[in-house]
Amino acid sequence: VSYTDCTSGQNYCLCGGNFCGDGKHCEMDGSENKCVDGEGTPKRQTSGPSDFEEFSLDDIEQ
């Protein structure tokens, strides 16, 4: 199941031939598109400090 990147914060989003609104998002399961309550699948957040291990300058100068 995949979702469009329209979120429930938008008033309207196109879901196949249907318009989703009122806090719904478009869910696509391959055979049909339907408007469902809630948010779509979250996008990956931008890289943050937790994505990298800390190292000291001494580790670089080898």
From Swiss-Prot:
Keywords: Disulfide bond, Glycoprotein, Protease inhibitor, Secreted, Serine protease inhibitor. Residues 37-62 are annotated as: Disordered. The keyword ATP-binding does not apply. Residues 1-3 are annotated as: Interaction with thrombin active site. Disulfide bonds join 6-13, 15-26, 20-35. Residues 51-62 are annotated as: Interaction with fibrinogen-binding exosite of thrombin. O-linked glycan consists of Fuc-Gal-GalNAc trisaccharide. One of its GO terms (cellular component) is extracellular region. Signal peptide: none annotated. One of its GO terms (molecular function) is serine-type endopeptidase inhibitor activity. It holds the Pfam family Hirudin. The record marks 41 as: Not glycosylated. Residues 51-62 have a biased composition (Acidic residues). InterPro entries: Hirudin, Hirudin/antistatin, Prot_inh_hirudin. It is found in: Secreted. Glycans are attached at residue 46. Inhibits thrombin, thereby abolishing its ability to cleave fibrinogen. Belongs to the protease inhibitor I14 (hirudin) family. This is Hirullin-P18.
